C-alpha cells in the first residue's frame, strides 16, 4: 500500500512522453511532500501516483532529492506567480494570500518538521520563485534608512502571522470566539492588522 492514499495515477491514465512524465512526477511529488514530508515520501509511491515506472525518477531527476527539489520549486513558482498577479504586480502579496496555496504551505511545513530546511532554502534563495525574498528585498529598497535588524524583525513577525493563520485558522476562530456569520468580517480585520505591520493596503 502507498504511504498516502490518493488517486493513482493522478491523470487517470499513464503519463507518456518526456514532458508529461516529468510533469506527472513533479505534481505527484508536490502533493506527497505536503501529505507526508520528505522523509516518509517514497519514490515508488510518487511514481505509482504519477502513473510511471519508478525508474523514471532517476532518469529525469537523478534520484529522490532531485525530484523533491523540482517539486518544491514548482510549488513555490506557482505561489510566486499567482501572488504577484493577485497583488497587481506589487512585491508584497495581499494579506493571507497564502491561504490560496495550502499545498505549498503544507509542503514547507512538512520539510521544517522533518528538519529539512535545506529543501525549503533551495527555493528561498531564488529571486525568481521566493515570495519571502521578494518581500524582504522590497522592504529594504523602500526603507533604505531603516535599521536592517529592525526591518528583518518586522518582516519575520509579519511572516509568522501569515504562517500561523494558515496553520491554525480554525483554532484561532474558536479562541477569538468568532460567531457563525462573523468569519468573513473577522478575516478582513485580520488582514487589516497584518497590512498595518508592513504598511500595505488591503482590498
Task: Identify the residue ranges that each predicted region occupies.
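C-terminal peripheral helix-coil segments that are non-catalytic and often amphipathic
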Residues: 1-8, 130-145, 167-203
Amino acid at each position: 500500500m502507498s504511504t498516502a492514499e490518493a488517486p493513482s495515477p493522478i491523470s487517470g491514465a499513464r503519463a507518456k512522453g518526456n514532458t508529461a512524465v516529468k510533469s506527472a512526477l513533479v505534481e505527484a511529488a508536490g502533493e506527497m511532500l505536503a501529505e507526508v514530508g520528505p522523509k516518509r515520501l517514497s519514490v515508488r509511491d510518487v511514481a505509482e501516483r504519477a502513473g510511471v515506472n519508478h525508474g523514471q525518477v532517476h532518469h529525469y531527476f537523478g534520484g529522490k532529492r532531485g525530484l523533491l527539489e523540482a517539486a518544491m520549486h514548482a510549488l513555490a513558482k506557482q505561489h510566486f506567480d499567482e501572488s504577484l498577479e493577485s497583488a497587481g504586480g506589487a512585491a508584497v502579496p495581499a494579506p493571507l494570500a497564502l491561504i490560496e496555496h495550502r499545498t505549498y504551505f503544507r509542503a514547507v511545513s512538512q520539510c521544517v518538521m522533518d528538519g529539512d530546511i535545506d529543501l525549503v532554502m533551495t527555493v528561498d534563495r531564488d529571486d525568481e520563485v521566493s515570495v519571502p525574498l521578494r518581500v524582504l528585498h522590497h522592504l529594504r529598497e523602500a526603507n533604505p534608512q531603516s535599521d536592517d535588524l529592525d526591518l528583518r524583525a518586522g518582516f519575520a513577525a509579519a511572516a509568522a502571522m501569515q504562517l500561523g493563520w494558515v496553520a491554525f485558522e480554525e483554532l484561532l476562530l474558536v479562541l477569538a470566539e468568532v460567531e457563525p456569520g462573523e468569519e468573513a468580517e473577522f478575516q478582513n480585520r485580520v488582514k487589516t492588522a497584518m497590512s498595518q505591520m508592513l504598511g500595505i493596503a488591503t482590498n
